[in-house]
Amino acid sequence: MGILEKIAEIEHEISRTQKNKATEYHLGLLKAKLAKYRQQLLEPTGKGGAKGEGFDVMKSGDARVAMVGFPSVGKSTLLSSMTSTHSEAAGYEFTTLTCIPGVISYNGANIQLLDLPGIIEGASQGKGRGRQVISVAKTADLILMMLDAGKSDQQKMLLERELEAVGIRLNKKPPNIYVKQKKVGGVKFTNTVPLTHCNEKLIMTVLHEYKIFNADVIFREDCTVDEFIDVIQGNRVYMTCLYVYNKVDQISIEEIDRLARMPHHVVISCEMNLNMDYLLEKMWEYLALVRVYTKKPGNAPDLGPEDGIILRGGATIEHCCHALHRSIAAQLRYAIVWGTSTKFSPQRVGLHHKLDHEDVIQIVKK
């Protein structure tokens, strides 16, 4: 029996098994086996084949955004309207056959936008170019899930299922679970919060399925057995995702209002150029980029649209130093910061001070 047949058999067994106290260990074992087989399917052991043409796109700019979606939902039209790149668009499916990059200039940042070929159902099983599309999507900082507003619920459900199957977790944080394997001593299980979704016996069942017999396991939050399996696998990618509903000019006002009120959702029309500015604002918010400015002693800071340094949200003075030159952090005596990240403006700070958007920094060397 091949891996695909084993996966299908386990999925069928899970779907027909009632969820209750008596079956939770059986279901936990099935889910662990399913995760193992999916990993084997998506990560072949051989050195096999060359990369697909157009998929080895070099990462550039300050952030990378990947558009995923079914064929003919408007990905190519969106890329062409938001960047200077032309991506072939037509009224038939599978117009885009390779990965096409474009660059969005916004708030002084260069954001790389990738138009990936349309994902079809079964991409997690290697159908079409699904595996290549998903491997590129995993390198992005933000996923734009393009959906046809007229088919939104069905497309969204299928895409989420495909991405879930390949280890991409959308708008979720990694579970606060610590697992450390050791050579001897058996399994030591500790939980710092009450567990409502699993217990020690179920955890042991999953560990034994993965041939783990000696380990320290600490649950610092109430997690499900699926989240515990994700931690053991260790190859899950946790990504922010914006659900972009295109072609809203073809649906009712009531449906547009319903979609727009849902979390992580944006409604647009590429053809009519509706709500594109709001989409850019949400992309900037979800990428969590900050722009900071530098100044020399005795001089005014350069606050022009092309000046400043783009950093990740939560970046510190140390990150800013590395962005300027790798030797500056070692030579830093202190930094003076003007902006919202300090209690006083200006204020003297050290290497580990976190910066806010549009802070002004003066570096003082030793």
Curated annotation (Swiss-Prot):
One Pfam family, short name: MMR_HSR1
UniProt xrefs under CDD domains: DRG (cd01896), TGS_DRG2 (cd17231)
Residues bound to GTP: 69-76, 115-119, 246-249
GO molecular function: GTP binding; GTPase activity
TGS domain segment(s): 288-365
Entries under InterPro entries matching the protein: Beta-grasp_dom_sf, DRG, G_OBG, GTP-bd, GTP-binding_2, GTP1-OBG_CS, P-loop_NTPase, Small_GTP-bd
Keyword Nucleotide-binding attached: yes
Gene Ontology biological-process entries: cytoplasmic translation
Residue ranges of domain OBG-type G in the record: 63-288
Transmembrane feature ranges: none
Family: Belongs to the TRAFAC class OBG-HflX-like GTPase superfamily. OBG GTPase family.
Protein name in the entry: Uncharacterized GTP-binding protein C02F5.3
